[in-house]
Amino acid sequence: MNSPIKLPKGSITMCGIDDFRDTLEPEHVVVTLCRWQPTWHHSDKNERHHYYFRAHDNDPAIWGHALNLVTDLLEADKDVLIHCVHGRDRTGGVVYMLLKMLDMSHDEVFKVMSEARPSQADEWSDRLYRREARYDKIIEEYINQYRERR
């Protein structure tokens, strides 16, 4: 079962399409990072956002857009449910970078993410380590662009 990561403002919960319905709560604002927008039941009242990009894209601007979207929702004190197909690569990357920007170490981020989404812990133990330098570069670019806009 997936659990929310409580943040200074709002929370973020991760899932994939296979456990989306089991994870979705009425208070969630849904951020979909899949290629196709999900089909919603007429009774679904959740606020929804859709942004697709390839999981292994190295363009900081593309990841930065996803970070902006989620950060804006969290700053508004929303409870965000973020998902992609597996809830691992795009979802994991965005959440990893968000937590790193809160001054958590790699090991702390891995622990928090694995506790929140235990089904991906084995995958993340390797993937997050291999992608750490790339994610750190994206974070640096994101922060620099944020400073330029201020």
Task: Describe the function of each predicted region.
Residues 1-81, 86, 93-150:
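Cys-dependent protein tyrosine phosphatase-like superfamily
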